Amino acid sequence: MRSDIIQKGYDKAPHRSLLRACGFKDEDFGKPIIGVANSYIDIVPGHVHLREFVEPIKEEIRKAGAIPVEFNTIGVDDGIAMGHYGMHYSLPSRELIADAIETVVEAHQLDGLICIPNCDKIVPGMLMGALRVNVPTVFISGGPMAAGKIGDKKVDLISVFEGVGKLNKGEITEKDLLVIEQNACPSCGSCSGLFTANSMNCLTEVLGLGLPGNGTTLAIDPRREMLARQAARQVVELVKIDLKPRDIVTKASFDNAFRVDIAMGGSSNTVLHLLAIAREAGIEYKMEDIDKISRETPTLCKISPSSDYHMDDLDRAGGISAIMKELLRNGLFDGKQRTVTTKTIEEIVKDVEIMDENVIRRIDNAYSKDGGLAILFGNLAPKGSVVKTAGVAKEMLQFKGKAICFDSEEEAIEGIRGGKVKPGHVVVIRYEGPKGGPGMREMLSPTSTIMGMGLGSSVALITDGRFSGGTRGACIGHISPEAAAGGPIGIVQDGDEILIDIPNRKLELLISQEEFDARLKAFKPKEKLIKSSWLKRYRKFVKDASEGAILSAD
């Protein structure tokens, strides 16, 4: 075992002495040591319950003959960090979490790992760390939040964000907004729609690193504890047979993950995260690969923010296993991929059926023949851009409008709320990319304000930043290269015509080639003054969004 290096031999007496101080007994030495990577934190609703949630996991690890050692990573609540300076730290936290996993597992030579994430950057950060250290690992997330209710109507966090826009327009009162605020988030868990956190938790199942049900079983459902206990037993079994993440996760696993993500209309952030996770697995994956899958994969689900269905509905309809089964049945999925259960996905979904075809549609009744996420290229995005098509109204799939440019999220919010943005505009928000932000902030406040003010069917938004999984509308993000790196989004001027053509995967600045070349040659990117030493380091080493916004010293 890996941990023999800290347990066995007379020369390890100092190590054992320290372990005894942590509660190890004579009979514990020689047993596998399982790292329990928790992410409990008091200010993130998806994580507030994880202090108690971890206890049965540790109990089951002990029963299975191993020793659990719990440690914690940090966590950021993107909703609380949204719309202000704090969002600069959200995406960078992913790298800190991956590094924390590596640091603890390698420093103590742990034999196995059970990861307990839940929210936006914690899931991909832990996935990156787990694939990097490559010890037997199982993921068991904290589970989705229940949807809120006002009368018979379901509400969620996006209802609150959009309510701010409605109040700004005069459609609702402050009292109405307070009622939404008080009812939108009724329990612990990751926010109740198919936003980034739940999208990523669902994809742990597809990648084979999470047990069936991990992505959709609610945090408050008693089955969540049963799943946690099963995960704890399973990680000990994986250590015994030495089945590691890189034995499970292959190029085909990522093909599967993108297919499911695209079929269910997951968050656009999954593109960024899966590219980064693939790199940690030693797998080359490109935006062009995602584009190909998107063109072949139909949209089978529309979950909030794209509809009134929520994660409890998706779970009731059969969950991720039912989506995988429908794709497999139609030759769009590789069922031979292994999982932490030691079974293949094909074996897992063999007896699964769709229980509600309104929530998960059959392929012959799909919402569209191509997927809920699309990659757009063009002179504005030579390396690609991302749009969640499942959240775009039909009349906005092809849109030509005049640019109105903002060089920060704050400027854009002020302009939208101040009435500068009119029907027919394409809002351009730049210098919000990985380097330019730095930190590639989410533009949920601008997009939800546009929707709340009733402009969602007449205004588009493009950015080198990214979006919350709760964003809907004609919103194109991850534009690469970004403005701070000299990308063409930096040369757009107010009044320029921009073409968004989602069916044909195009994003174009409609000026002459001569004018385009002249502007690009003369363009000198701005650089924001950043005081934080961490964000300065991040800006120096972060790569393009088309590469997953990873950190690299190469």
From Swiss-Prot:
Please give the GO cellular component terms listed in this UniProt entry.
cytosol
Q: Which domain of life is it from?
A: Bacteria
N6-carboxylysine modification, residue list = K121
Query: Which biological process terms from the Gene Ontology are attached to this UniProt entry?
Result: isoleucine biosynthetic process; L-valine biosynthetic process
Listed A to Z, the keywords are: 2Fe-2S, Amino-acid biosynthesis, Branched-chain amino acid biosynthesis, Iron, Iron-sulfur, Lyase, Magnesium, Metal-binding
Q: Kindly report, in one word, the top-level EC class recorded for this enzyme.
A: lyase
State the species of origin. Hydrogenobaculum sp. (strain Y04AAS1)
Family matches, as PANTHER family = D-XYLONATE DEHYDRATASE, D-XYLONATE DEHYDRATASE YAGF-RELATED
> By what name is this protein known?
Dihydroxy-acid dehydratase
Recite the UniProt cofactor note for this protein: Binds 1 [2Fe-2S] cluster per subunit. This cluster acts as a Lewis acid cofactor.
Q: Name one Pfam family in it.
A: ILVD_EDD_N
Q: Which cofactor does it need?
A: [2Fe-2S] cluster; Mg(2+)
**Residue positions binding Mg(2+):** D78, D120, K121, E442
Task: Using the record for this protein, list the coiled-coil segments as residue ranges, or answer none.
Answer: none
- Keyword Transcription: yes or no? no
Q: Which residues bind [2Fe-2S] cluster?
A: C119, C191
- Pathway as given in its UniProt record: Amino-acid biosynthesis; L-isoleucine biosynthesis; L-isoleucine from 2-oxobutanoate: step 3/4; Amino-acid biosynthesis; L-valine biosynthesis; L-valine from pyruvate: step 3/4
